A protein has these predicted regions:
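Active-site neighborhoods and metal-handling regions in enzymes and metal-associated proteins
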Residues: 1-231
Length: 231
């Protein structure tokens, strides 16, 4: 949630404020960690040290106000570089085996959370109770945090893509939708599952099976190099 990364051909620096400096020094290994004091003066000092004439800013993470401040206060030409953002996205797209293993671990925690909820969800539970129980259980079994605010919705509320859990109680014959994920060592999982409490109607079965068929078709077709649009 904070920090400024500067990458020069010779060396990289991570400038971070006092709240996170201790953790950064323990976890950041690819660059020199610097305690933030007077940020723009510190950046200018590094620009001068490395003889940089231009600074490219990642437009994916830089706000307009930050960009204007850089342009006004840095002793170099500041470029809002869309190409830099593309390069960073490409680098992040391909994961190392270590990163993949951590994502898998995060997903396994979420899967165990879902399995736990199958016994917890019943008629009379509120959406908030379902959300809180799922959050608590994932944290209990190893999640360091939640990937995002857990969504737990029931009945007609399940049509809301990013609805907020309410005090609505689950009724028999309703769908319950859960969108959730766990974080493990900085890596996130994300999954959505829908269950029915009681006996589903024929229409509910049809809708569920239609979505399931589409999912299985996509899983069978997906391959390396395929675009999301083609899939």
């Amino acid at each position: 949630s904070a920090g400024t990364l500067l990458v020069f051909p010779e060396k990289a620096y991570f400038i971070i404020d006092f709240r996170y400096i201790e953790k950064a020094k323990k976890t950041v290994t690819a660059c020199e960690v610097i305690l933030q004091d007077k940020l723009y003066e510190q950046i200018n000092s590094l620009i001068e040290k490395h003889g940089a004439k231009t600074v490219s800013v990642n437009v994916d993470t830089c706000t307009l106000s930050e960009l204007i401040a850089y342009q006004q206060k840095l002793n170099a030409e500041v470029i809002a570089d869309t190409k830099l953002a593309e390069i960073i996205r490409e680098i992040r797209t391909v994961k190392s085996q270590e990163q993949i293993d951590k994502i898998i671990k995060a997903q396994r925690i979420a899967e165990k959370g879902f399995a736990h909820m199958l016994d917890f969800i019943r008629v009379g539970r509120t959406e908030k109770e379902i959300q809180l129980e799922l959050d608590y259980y994932m944290l209990k079994i190893g999640a360091e945090a939640l990937s995002f605010d857990t969504i737990a919705l029931s009945g007609s509320n399940t049509s809301l893509p990013h609805g907020v859990p309410s005090d609505k109680k689950v009724e028999s014959g309703e769908f319950v939708l859960m969108d959730f994920g766990a974080t493990y060592d900085g890596w996130h999982s994300d999954m959505t599952r829908t269950v029915c409490v009681g006996k589903p109607s024929d229409k509910m079965k049809s809708v569920y099976e239609t979505v399931l068929t589409a999912q299985l078709t996509a899983l069978d077709a997906v391959k390396a190099g395929m675009s999301g649009k083609a899939l």
